[in-house]
Amino acid sequence: MTSLTIPGLDQAPTTHARLLSWVREVAELTTPDRVVWCDGSQDEWQRLTEQLVEAGTFKRLEKKPNSFYAASDPSDVARVEERTFICSREEKDAGVTNYWMQPDEMKAIMTELYRGCMRGRTMYVIPFCMGPLDADKPKLGVEITDTAYVVVSMHIMTRMGSKVLERLGEDEDFVEALHSVGAPLEPGQQDVPWPCNDTKYITHFPEERKIWSFGSGYGGNALLGKKCFSLRIASAMARDEGWLAEHMLILKLISPEDKVHYVAAAFPSACGKTNLAMLQPTIPGWRVESLGDDIAWMRFGEDGRLYAVNPEAGFFGVAPGTNWKTNPNAMRTIDQGNSLFTNVALTDDGDVWWEEMEGEPQHLTDWKGRDWTPQSDEKAAHPNSRYCTPMSQCPILAPEWDDPNGVPISAILFGGRRKTTIPLVNEAFDWQHGVFMGATLSSEKTAAAAGKVGEVRRDPMAMLPFIGYNVGDYFQHWVNVGKEADSSKLPRIFYVNWFRRDESGKKIVWPGFGENSRVLKWIVERLDGNAAAEDTPIGRVPSADQIDLSGLDTPREDVETALHVDVEEWKAELPLIEEWFASIGDSLPSSMRDEFEALKQRLGA
């Protein structure tokens, strides 16, 4: 099929020469039946969701307005880290945490995979913007995809459509993001509800600011504005331009006196990031408003402070474990509708359900389409099942969430899921020590990434799967950001662990969720000079007396266990840090080695 015969290709609502040329090149390679330029309108949403219902990909939910359920192919349920590549020109620029292939070699392989891969399908062109569209220099992208599921998800997760195309004008720069599920259809061939391919590649070309994804229709592999652009490509941009692109929530903490602090926090997947982002404090008079639950782009303002903006427009949250106790604000957000649910379970009356949601039904249809009862062996919802919902529906959304200038960050938190060793909260001695804390962040593996659940792995700044360049250079970039700033204006860095267990290893000693507001209160009191801490070998840690425990029904000894710094446990941690740093090799900054030696000295090791 020549380009002349592909309907829609020549009806482009733009005169942007590079965009037109790229779209034509992709269409000629992938040979779709038609090309559709997405405008982001409500009509487009209606049309595509109806198409997806007819195709069997979506089921319309009876109990949530304008909301839909999808079940993926059981082989396509999570990010595939072993099929995710950073194809920098030089292998050393990808570093030890990324898979690398020579860019031309990768392009040759993927070009053959893309050849004819959209046959029988529609090619959608999605202009999108990460972050507010009225920013001085917005970060623009265009995703080409062959699945309407991606288009409607991008409606929720990004600012997209005609307004972005206008902003692109005739020659504005943009990130090229090419996606195909890799499932061409022969004439008369019946489609499947969730097309995908056993061969998967999620590839990034950081110097060229390009993303090529093939074979997966799932979330982060297919919604290329999310991890691919906002973290992997953006982290490379941030290194070059002197800012930070991070896997962080942004929250606004308001004291009873209406004093405001903005906090950014980095946690690996399934460690409570979304719950903290939408926290409902249990201590009287304190309030939280949300600005984002997953990604923060931070750059210095004219006043020398670090300002954060959330590049996304929606929440793409892990469903299991989300309920009216753990995250009432997420439940209120999705209850308003206009949402997509993938790989959760379906109730008999046309609603969604997942593990730990209130009121377990006696019968469900599980994510694989089978009958499910409480006696069933398998879980009804996949552990990495997701809701995709507009941020604008969040009842505690901070009005500043859409401000292109961002909000000034007072504190940065790092945290992971550790049963031992790491105390409830720990303040860094200074910025460089805080970078060391982030660089050595560790967590037990979760379901969001394929692999063995439960093993402890290093997850620097919760960015292990998302750093778009060499991890050692990434640490150096963090150190440089601190060196080039006025240290009095830098955010203070803290490390938290909500998941410490008692000696039996069975009970999590800190109640978490809304009670985490007590830890946030201590943190902002530290910022304001109104709270004490004890200097320990690992940082500044409060005693139980220094945290507001009023009205908390957790035994004091449990709080003390949560805060305890066990020197012997920390000595056992040292070889693990040593091994991690050794794996990074020559690119590890000397400052990180210095911090490690200083920690050893303080521990008497």
UniProtKB/Swiss-Prot annotation:
Its cofactor is Mn(2+). GO terms for biological process: cellular response to glucose stimulus; gluconeogenesis; glycerol biosynthetic process from pyruvate; oxaloacetate metabolic process; propionate catabolic process; response to lipid; response to starvation. Mn(2+) binds at residues 227, 247, 294. Pathway: Carbohydrate biosynthesis; gluconeogenesis. GTP binds at residues 270-275, 386, 417, 513-516. Residues 364-381 have a biased composition (Basic and acidic residues). Its EC number is 4.1.1.32. It catalyses: oxaloacetate + GTP = phosphoenolpyruvate + GDP + CO2. It is found in: Cytoplasm. The keyword Cell inner membrane does not apply. Catalyzes the conversion of oxaloacetate (OAA) to phosphoenolpyruvate (PEP), the rate-limiting step in the metabolic pathway that produces glucose from lactate and other precursors derived from the citric acid cycle. Belongs to the phosphoenolpyruvate carboxykinase [GTP] family. Monomer. This is Phosphoenolpyruvate carboxykinase [GTP]. It comes from Saccharopolyspora erythraea (strain ATCC 11635 / DSM 40517 / JCM 4748 / NBRC 13426 / NCIMB 8594 / NRRL 2338).
